[in-house]
């Protein structure tokens, strides 16, 4: 490496080196300041997680219903849909009618998937037994002895 090339490299990267040294120095200063200036609690409750003022009872390892995971997956799917539609909305003038048709087909496919999920009961939170029990009942309440349509 010649002298002019080394000087050019140093001139090119000096700002990054100053930034890196400053960032590491600031992090070290904050960590050391917290170590020497912070309080030290030696109580038994120091290692117990905070539970909104309530004492912890039982194990934190609880079995979760699979429906929570389904809702999370649905959220991710429709969040990605929103991301694609946002990208389309930003470029709507450049893509023209062809882009509009593609977006409409995309939305139609997603709506068909949503209707399918509703039809198979993937979004239904009640147990199958209680759905069967309420299927035969009328949702009309009688306030008097007469039927509401009489």
Swiss-Prot record:
Compartments it resides in: Cell inner membrane
Keyword Transport included in the entry's annotation: yes
CC annotations in GO: NADH dehydrogenase complex; plasma membrane
The protein's enzyme class: translocase
Domain of life per record: Bacteria
Reactions catalysed according to its record: a quinone + NADH + 5 H(+)(in) = a quinol + NAD(+) + 4 H(+)(out)
Topology versus the membrane: Multi-pass membrane protein
One Pfam family this sequence matches: Oxidored_q4
Keywords of the record: Cell inner membrane, Cell membrane, Membrane, NAD, Quinone, Translocase, Transmembrane, Transmembrane helix, Transport, Ubiquinone
Residues annotated as transmembrane: 14-34, 70-90, 98-118
Keyword Transport: yes
Example GO molecular function: NADH dehydrogenase (ubiquinone) activity
Quaternary assembly: NDH-1 is composed of 13 different subunits. Subunits NuoA, H, J, K, L, M, N constitute the membrane sector of the complex.
Family, per entry: Belongs to the complex I subunit 3 family.
Role noted for this protein: NDH-1 shuttles electrons from NADH, via FMN and iron-sulfur (Fe-S) centers, to quinones in the respiratory chain. The immediate electron acceptor for the enzyme in this species is believed to be ubiquinone. Couples the redox reaction to proton translocation (for every two electrons transferred, four hydrogen ions are translocated across the cytoplasmic membrane), and thus conserves the redox energy in a proton gradient.
Name of the protein in its database record: NADH-quinone oxidoreductase subunit A
Gene name linked to the record: nuoA
């Amino acid at each position: 490496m010649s002298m002019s090339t080394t000087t050019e490299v140093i001139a090119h990267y000096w700002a990054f080196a100053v930034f890196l040294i400053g960032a590491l120095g600031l992090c070290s200063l904050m960590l050391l300041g917290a170590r020497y200036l912070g309080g030290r609690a030696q109580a038994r409750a120091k290692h117990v997680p905070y539970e909104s003022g309530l004492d912890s009872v039982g194990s934190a390892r609880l079995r979760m219903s699979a429906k929570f995971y389904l809702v999370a997956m649905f959220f991710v799917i429709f969040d990605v849909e929103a991301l694609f539609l946002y990208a389309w909305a930003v470029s709507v003038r450049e893509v023209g009618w062809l882009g509009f048709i593609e977006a409409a087909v995309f939305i139609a496919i997603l709506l068909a998937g949503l209707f399918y999920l509703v039809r198979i009961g993937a979004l239904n939170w009640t147990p199958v037994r209680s759905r069967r029990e309420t299927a035969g009942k009328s949702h009309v309440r009688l306030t008097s002895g007469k039927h509401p349509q009489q």
